[in-house]
UniProtKB/Swiss-Prot annotation:
CDD domains: Rac1_like. InterPro entries: P-loop_NTPase (IPR027417), Small_GTP-bd (IPR005225), Small_GTPase (IPR001806), Small_GTPase_Rho (IPR003578). Transmembrane segments: none annotated. Belongs to the small GTPase superfamily. Rho family. A motif (Effector region) lies at residues 32-40. It holds the Pfam family Ras. Keywords: Cell membrane, GTP-binding, Lipoprotein, Membrane, Methylation, Nucleotide-binding, Prenylation. Interacts with forH. Interacts with pakB. May interact with limE. Interacts (in GTP-bound form) with rgaA. This is Rho-related protein rac1A. Its main location: membrane. Residues 192-194 form a propeptide. The gene is rac1A.
Amino acid sequence: MQAIKCVVVGDGAVGKTCLLISYTTNAFPGEYIPTVFDNYSANVMVDGKPINLGLWDTAGQEDYDRLRPLSYPQTDVFLICFSIISPSSFENVNGKWHPEICHHAPNVPIILVGTKLDMREDKETQDRLKEKKLYPISYEQGLAKMKEINAVKYLECSALTQKGLKTVFDEAIRAVINPPLSKKKKSSGGCNIL
């Protein structure tokens, strides 16, 4: 059985841990949400192939900047997460997360993930952002960012409703077991030296 290591990165509070808990338990976490989810291993079938998927959570806060890269060696695929309702987390995709991954783990495929999809149409959330002259991140903006950082895919999901959640992990596995043909020739990764 092929083993795949998937590491999840992104700003604090974008929903990385909820994403992992919701996916692995089929339930949104209750009151207590840990800073970092314990590493988790699941046997899944994707495209008829049995896969042992190892999921690694990371802490997004700056306090962990020196420790976080210790989980990067031997990673097969990264999920860079941002919250659809947090423009600053979206900016940090290429302000922080993409450069960090390229430095520590070049040539590893990246999936860009917009979290909190259920909140994009939430009136209260929209009003709170508008007060700061901000708006939720659109699907088109996510696609543009995917191309900018040379990610394999851009996906959106909600850990709360589970919409798009399984697809995120299925596509992460596919990025490893069926790398896109155009990338096979060059490299399988999402890092370009500029």
